[in-house]
């Protein structure tokens, strides 16, 4: 399955929530009408969505939010099952540990897609080494930095300013002068993704 390249607002409306696919500088506002499904006037249905439908919808929402394809997502779920603790929480923590997501959380990209592009174009280092794999899992204590060639990009500095004004997550520490940050710890489940119901995804893969 290829990555979706169409209108981001359409995806948000399909899932009924903001997927944070667009920069806060161009945030999806009221016009997106998340509660209205794609189509000129939205699709209507007199039938209640099945449990399977709800589970599938939640999985699709999380995949699109983090920009992960089905095969990758299944691998993350398998790893989450192998780890101790709650499988659903483990799954989300794995997704949060992806390098592209950490770059986004640190404010070096205004969206996960922009952060992913920065990584793939070799604009990011981890502990001083260039890493261009978006799915690379960042560990506690790792230092993630913007390379010199990428520091000149106005979008990087603008994104960081915006992120700082909105408040950076507690699990990262960012030096705005050096354009680098430390992944202080894995976030607690209650620190992010309050609109995600990971138990539905666990139920889906347990069928």
Curated annotation (Swiss-Prot):
It holds the Pfam family Ribosomal_S4. InterPro entries: Ribosomal_uS4 (IPR022801), Ribosomal_uS4_bac-type (IPR005709), Ribosomal_uS4_CS (IPR018079), Ribosomal_uS4_N (IPR001912), S4_RNA-bd (IPR002942), S4_RNA-bd_sf (IPR036986). GO terms for biological process: ribosomal small subunit biogenesis; translation. SMART domains: Ribosomal_S4, S4. The keyword Cell division does not apply. The keyword Transport does not apply. GO terms for cellular component: small ribosomal subunit. One of the primary rRNA binding proteins, it binds directly to 16S rRNA where it nucleates assembly of the body of the 30S subunit. Part of the 30S ribosomal subunit. Contacts protein S5. The interaction surface between S4 and S5 is involved in control of translational fidelity. This is Small ribosomal subunit protein uS4. It comes from Methylibium petroleiphilum (strain ATCC BAA-1232 / LMG 22953 / PM1). The gene is rpsD.
């Amino acid at each position: 399955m290829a990555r979706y390249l169409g209108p981001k607002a359409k995806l948000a409306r399909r899932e009924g929530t903001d997927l944070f696919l667009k920069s806060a500088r161009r945030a999806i506002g009221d016009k997106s009408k998340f509660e209205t499904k794609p189509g000129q006037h939205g699709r209507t249905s007199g039938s209640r969505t099945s449990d399977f439908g709800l589970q599938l919808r939640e999985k699709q929402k999380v995949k699109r939010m983090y920009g992960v394809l089905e095969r990758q997502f299944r691998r993350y779920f398998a790893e989450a099952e192998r780890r101790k603790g709650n499988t659903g929480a483990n799954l989300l923590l794995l997704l949060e540990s992806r390098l592209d997501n950490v770059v986004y959380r640190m404010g070096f990209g205004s969206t996960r897609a922009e952060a992913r592009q920065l990584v793939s174009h070799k604009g990011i280092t981890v502990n001083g080494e260039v890493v261009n794999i978006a799915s690379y899992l960042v560990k506690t204590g790792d230092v993630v930095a913007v390379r010199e060639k990428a520091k000149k990009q106005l979008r990087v500095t603008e994104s960081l300013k915006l992120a700082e004004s909105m408040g950076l997550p507690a699990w990262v520490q960012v030096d705005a002068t050096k354009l680098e940050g430390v992944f202080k710890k894995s976030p607690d489940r209650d620190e992010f993704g309050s609109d995600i119901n990971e138990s539905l995804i666990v139920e889906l893969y347990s069928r």
